[in-house]
């Protein structure tokens, strides 16, 4: 029975990954077409360069969204298959303690707090840092937001997504 569940979760993960890749491909194509249109109508070389930069930013965001969806799909598969291995009387608490395979610190290595932000055990325990306005996403020039270790970090503006978009949701009805 467990083998069938694992196979089903793998198929589901593969299907949602294909959907995420297709969506990213469409976003990249849209960015390229929009860039070409803007370059054709622009007379100033600066405007043409700006159109190219906008295209590259959109393409990078599409790739980041695809990678985030893949990570989400992998985590969902692991969560579903792990839940099947638990016997009666066992449960997870979601306390956030133990070994983490993901970052448990906020920007620049600051702890993010002890509030669980996901219903799935082991999926982060952080809160946003700084002032947060509901429904507003901050804007940062690409490559200037440096995270721990000097690596560039990205913000997935589509986290959670729309229920009917590819790569998101539980797969149920």
UniProtKB/Swiss-Prot annotation:
Q: What Gene Ontology biological process does one annotation of this record name?
A: embryo development ending in seed dormancy
Corresponding gene? GMPM1
Q: Where is the composition biased (Low complexity)?
A: 92-106
Q: Where is the composition biased (Basic and acidic residues)?
A: 1-12, 25-68
- State what protein this is by name: 18 kDa seed maturation protein
Which PANTHER family does UniProt cross-reference here? Answer: LATE EMBRYOGENESIS ABUNDANT PROTEIN 46, LATE EMBRYOGENESIS ABUNDANT PROTEIN 6-RELATED
Which molecular function term from Gene Ontology is one that the record holds?
A: oligosaccharide binding
Q: What species is given as this protein's source?
A: Glycine max (Soybean)
**Segments for region (Disordered):** 1-173
Q: Write down the Pfam families for this protein, in alphabetical order.
A: LEA_1
- Transmembrane spans: none
Covalent S-S links between cysteines: none
Where composition is biased (Polar residues), the residues are 70-79
Family indicated by similarity = Belongs to the LEA type 1 family.
